[in-house]
Amino acid sequence: MMATAFKWALEFNTPMALITLAATVSWGFFGVRVVVAGSLKSVHEMKSGVVLSCLLLGLLNPAFFYWILFTAYDLLPAQDAMAINYTWGLTLPLVASVFSRTLPTKYETGLALLSYLGILVIATNGNLGALEFDRPAGVALALLSTVIWSLSWVINSRIIDANNIDPELALFLNFSAALPLLWIVTVLAGQMPTNSMGSLLGGIYIGLFEMGIAFVLWMRAMRLTDNPLRISSLIFLAPPLSLLLIGTVLNETIAGSTLVGLVIILMGLAGQQWLDRAR
């Protein structure tokens, strides 16, 4: 659903305009929730360094992350961006291992390389011998977005756990820092959201569901698990539905190289899950 929503919404707005519109909706969503819950008052009890950390992290995610992600979706077919985006299930535990100072095993490294082989299949349209990349900028941005997303969520979770902060308050601070910057850049770049129903609906849906409710559920899941790989197992549920929506709603013809690449990526992720359960 996410890939279809992103690509459809980008028909009405530039990536910068879309993230600004969606982030405004998300900021309002989190603002209402922290006010109703009464957690906004606790900002005065937080250390200034912690508040500053939450604000600065907002420049990374949502501001920079979603601009990178939406630009990747703007440059790539939705099916390719969606498939590459699934490697967050691999990137997240790798980034987490850096913070926990544990090196991945040779098996984990091999499975990671297998997943990235799938990306190579997608990026070259299956022409691995020639290594001629189709839309290399979009592929690079899609990959970069998984690193930025994983990095921001691991750091955010550590800040929340170390300081016993309400996760939704932390997210509200993230968006509070990102929003002024996004609007300034949007205005200066002359990329204001378009005045259309599609623009409004796309911004509201992405801001409320993909960046609002989804953020709340994901943050709670991150706090309740001691192993991010367990959460990333949910990644296997979405690809068939995503491809169906992309084909029917966006009328994209699903390429054979996309299917093959996605299967290889999911094989690597499945291997990671098997290793986790075998420990």
Task: Give the residues covered by each predicted segment.
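Helix-helix packing/entry segments at the starts of transmembrane helices
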Residues: 18-21, 80-87, 156-177, 211-248
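Specific transmembrane alpha-helical segments of multi-pass solute transporters/efflux pumps
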Residues: 1-3, 38-85, 121, 207-225
